[in-house]
Curated annotation (Swiss-Prot):
<feature type="binding site">
    <location>
        <begin position="7"/>
        <end position="12"/>
    </location>
    <ligand>
        <name>substrate</name>
    </ligand>
</feature>
<feature type="binding site">
    <location>
        <position position="70"/>
    </location>
    <ligand>
        <name>Mg(2+)</name>
    </ligand>
</feature>
<keyword id="KW-0546">Nucleotide metabolism</keyword>
<keyword id="KW-0460">Magnesium</keyword>
<dbReference type="InterPro" id="IPR002637">
    <property type="entry name" value="RdgB/HAM1"/>
</dbReference>
<keyword id="KW-0547">Nucleotide-binding</keyword>
<dbReference type="InterPro" id="IPR020922">
    <property type="entry name" value="dITP/XTP_pyrophosphatase"/>
</dbReference>
<keyword id="KW-0479">Metal-binding</keyword>
<feature type="binding site">
    <location>
        <begin position="182"/>
        <end position="183"/>
    </location>
    <ligand>
        <name>substrate</name>
    </ligand>
</feature>
<feature type="binding site">
    <location>
        <begin position="154"/>
        <end position="157"/>
    </location>
    <ligand>
        <name>substrate</name>
    </ligand>
</feature>
<dbReference type="GO" id="GO:0000166">
    <property type="term" value="F:nucleotide binding"/>
</dbReference>
<dbReference type="GO" id="GO:0036220">
    <property type="term" value="F:ITP diphosphatase activity"/>
</dbReference>
<comment type="subunit">
    <text>Homodimer.</text>
</comment>
<dbReference type="Pfam" id="PF01725">
    <property type="entry name" value="Ham1p_like"/>
</dbReference>
<dbReference type="InterPro" id="IPR029001">
    <property type="entry name" value="ITPase-like_fam"/>
</dbReference>
<dbReference type="GO" id="GO:0009117">
    <property type="term" value="P:nucleotide metabolic process"/>
</dbReference>
<dbReference type="GO" id="GO:0036222">
    <property type="term" value="F:XTP diphosphatase activity"/>
</dbReference>
Amino acid sequence: MKIVIASSHGYKIRETKTFLKQLGSFDIFSLTDFPNYYAPKEVGSLPEENALAKGLHAARELNSWVIADDTMLMVPALNGLPGKLSATFAGEDACDKDHRKKLLQEMQSLESIVDRSAYFECCIVLASPEGKFFKTRGICEGYISHQEKGSSGFGYDSLFLKYDYKQTFAELSEDIKNQVSHRAKALQKLAPYLQDLLEKQLVSRN
């Protein structure tokens, strides 16, 4: 079964590919295989709004089942920021390091773990060319470190510590992160829908 990962981000593609290969026999592609495809601009205030828009658009344009996701980092003490600005917190043209630096600056007066609490929210959408879709949600709670730690991952990983771990996401091995992260939780909830699609395809072939 052909399925397209609606992302050109190497880490997201790798994590989703690993998950799909464990489930069954998929012909896996990503947006890197479609250089002429243009994704819609993310304008939603919630992860599910962006994931749904990306998924339905890509499925229709590429004529394939698609997996799309959107993730936001929420810091309650900052009224939910970065939130929908997670990818542009320090500006449209800023890099991940700039976003992390701005977050640390915004939180410099917050000392306790309670005040520095944060969570990642991820929504994943499985969409068909006909407009059918299934969506799942994963949340990972933790807090923001006072300084960057670790060199793996991307985005805010080097600042985020999951409550029951003493390492940031950027310090965890990729295998462990892929089991406990917000995206991992959302992908795991998607498994029954994908397995059902595979079974239906096998039946139709027979």
